[in-house]
Swiss-Prot record:
It comes from Drosophila melanogaster (Fruit fly). The keyword Secreted applies. This is Uncharacterized protein CG3556. The keyword Magnesium does not apply. GO terms for cellular component: extracellular space. PANTHER family: TRANSCOBALAMIN II, TRANSCOBALAMIN-1/GASTRIC INTRINSIC FACTOR. It comes from the Eukaryota.
Amino acid sequence: MLSLSSPPWLLLLVLFFFANGSATVVSLAENVTLATLPSTSPISVSFSTTSSVVAPISTELENQTASSSNLNTNNEASDEQTGNSNSNTSSHSRNINGLPSSNSNIDNANSNSSSVSSLSTTTSAISGVDQQESLILATPTALNGSGTPPEHQTIGQAPPTKGEQEAILRALDWLKEKRASDYGWGNDTHVVILAKELSGGRDPNDSVDGHVQVIQELEDTLSVKEMEIEILAMLDRHHTLPKPLDLDKLARYVLALGSLCKDPKHFHGHDLVATLQHHEPAQDIEFALTTLSACSSAAHVRKRQIRRLLDIASGVTDQSVDAIAMVILALRCIVTDHRHRHLQHFVRRPARGLATLQDQRGSFGSLRSTALAMQALQDLEYDPAGHWNRTAASRYILSRQRADGGWSEEPLQDGQEPDIGVGLTADIILALGWKGLGAVRALQCDHVIRESSDPTENGEPKLAVPFGLSSSAEESDAKNISYTYTLWVGSNVTESFSLSLVSPKNTSFFKAMTQAAEMDPRFIFEAREWPNGHYVHTLYGKKEEPRGYHYWLLYRLPELPDPNNTPGNQLIAPVGVDELMVEDGEHYLYWYKKL
C-alpha cells in the first residue's frame, strides 16, 4: 500500500518544489535584470496608462535627460533639502534620472515583470517625474544644458536648503551675541532687523521655553525702538544743523520699517518716503535703492524716476554689480504694480548683463555683491540668455562662513577686528533666505494694500512707455501737463528767469520753448536746423562762444533749480530739444555757463 501511494506523494512534492523554485527563479531574474541597469541610464516612462493629471508633464519634459553627475552638481541645493547624498542608492536620485526617454532594456524588463511589478514601476516612475518637475521649478540650474524649459517657467520658489537654513540660524545666533547694550547694532541696526524679519528667525516648531520666548520678543521690541530713535535723531540733525541726509541709510530705514509692517509715510509725524523722493541722489546705486524703498512702501514712483532707472539699465556695461542688482530690484518692484506690468520686459536686459558677471566659483565679486546679485536674480522667469547658477553662488557664500557663524570680507584691512561683518552677515541672510530686499513689497501689509488699491496714478491709468522705446495709445490722450522752464546766465548764476507753463501731453521741449518765447521776450531764442533736429545757440540775446567755452546746456530736473545748489552733469538732458518730451511736474533749465 505504501509502494502504491509513494509515486503520487513524490510527484506532488516534485511538482511543488518546481513550482516554488520556478517562482523564485522568475522573481530573482526580474530583480537581477532591474538591478544590473546602470545608474545613469534614463528610465523610460509611458504616460499612456496614467491619469490626465500627469500627461502634460510628459509633453513638457519629453526627450529631456540629465546625467546623475550633472544633476548632483547643479541641483545640490535641492539634494540637501531632501537629505539625498548618493545618486546610485537613493530612490530620489534614481527618479531624477527618470526623465521620459526610450530604453529597450527597461522596456524588456517591464514586459517580463508581473502586473503587480509593472504597476509598482509605473507608480514609482510617475512619482519620480513629479519630483523632477518640482526640482526644476525650485532650482535655477536644473535645466542647464538639458533642453528647453516649459514656457513662463518661474524659477526659485523653493525654500532655503537644509545647509542654508543651518547657516542662517548660526548667523542669527552670532548677530544676537553682537547686539550692543542699547539693543542695537551700531550703524547696522536697520539691516539686522530687516534680515531677522524676512528670514523668519527660528522655526516656530522648535521647542522654546515660553519665558525665553517672551524675553526674545521684548529684546526685539527694544531693538526696533533703538532704530526709531536713530531715525528721529538723523531727522533732527538734518533740520537743525542743517546736515545733509544720508539717503542710503534713510532708504534702508524705510525698508526695515516696511518689513515690520510699519508705515514709513506716518512715522511719528514724518513722511520718510516723501523725504526720500524730495532728495534725488546723484549716484545711480543710491537712486535705485531710494526708488526701491519708495516702491516697497506702495508710494507713487514718478515717471522721471522710472526713466532714469531704464536709462541706467540700458547701460549695464558701465555699471557695477551692486548698481545693476539694485536697479533690477527696483524695476521688479515697480512692475509688480498692475499699472506698470507692460514695462516688465525691460528687466530682462540688466538681468542678462548681471548673470554674465558670475565667475566660475559662483561669486559676483565680493561677498556683499554676490549676496545682492542673488537677491536680484532669484525668482526670475527662466531666460537661456541670462542663465546663472544659484547653487554655485550659495556654495561659494557658505564656504566663506566663519566658525562663529558670521561673515567678513577677506583679507581684513589694517585695524579691523576679526569679528566685524554685522551688516554683511545680515545681507547674506537675506540672500540665503530667498527673501531679500525685493520681498518687502510682497508682505502685503495694511498700508501697502491700501495704497495699491488706488486704481489710478495721479489721474492716469498707468505709466506710458518712455519716449523713444515704444509708442502707446495712452500717450495720445489730450491731457494738459504743468512744468517750469528756467534760464540761468553765468557760471555763478548772475541772472535767473522762470516760467510756469501748461502744454498738451506729448509736447516736445522745442515747442515748449516756442510757447515760452511768445509769453516772455526774455525766452526768445535762435536755433539752427540740422537733419537730426534743432540746435539752440542763442537765448536771452546770449549767443554761445566756442572760443571762450561758453555754451547753453539743457537740464531736466526733479525739482525747481536752486542757484545755491547747482545741478550736476548727470542731470543734463540725454536727448535734443526735439526728442525731449516735457512731463508733468518736471523742471527744465537752460544754463549759459563756461565749460
